[in-house]
């Protein structure tokens, strides 16, 4: 198949995770620095990671509100998806990512006993991994299309 890349898109960072070749597990890769205000989206680094990891599709988290409405961050994630689609011409899917960052922080506190400073360095990468793992577990449509 190839790997899927999961992305947790923020205004200053993008957490990146990739699946294994079978589409069973997700692993955090890194956090790419971006700056929405300056129109710097880290696409050169994403391109390197796409090539290194033989990525065949993207999964982006949509940070919906708890009442299932969409706010500005959902629109920003969709816009980032459009940038990826234009640059890479690879399929893209979205998954509801409500509470993945909260879950990631809880995991880091409870299981890793990580300090606040350490958590800040890895939380977006872990959130991207959770987004992608949830997608893989739900057998998202890209898995069906690419197999």
Swiss-Prot record:
Pfam family membership, one: RuvX
SMART domains the UniProt entry points to: YqgFc
Example of a GO MF term: nuclease activity
EC number(s) given by UniProt: 3.1.-.-
Main location: cytoplasm
Key words, A-Z: Cytoplasm, Hydrolase, Nuclease, Ribosome biogenesis
Residues of the signal peptide: none
Localization per record: Cytoplasm
Cellular component terms (Gene Ontology): cytosol
Biological processes annotated in GO: rRNA 5'-end processing
InterPro entries tied to this protein: RNaseH-like_sf (IPR012337), YqgF (IPR005227), YqgF/RNaseH-like_dom (IPR006641), YqgF/RNaseH-like_dom_sf (IPR037027)
Similarity comment: Belongs to the YqgF nuclease family.
Role description: Could be a nuclease involved in processing of the 5'-end of pre-16S rRNA.
NCBIfam families tied to this protein: RNAse_H_YqgF
Protein name, as recorded: Putative pre-16S rRNA nuclease
Species for this entry: Ligilactobacillus salivarius (strain UCC118)
Lineage, uppermost ranks: Bacteria, Bacillati, Bacillota, Bacilli, Lactobacillales
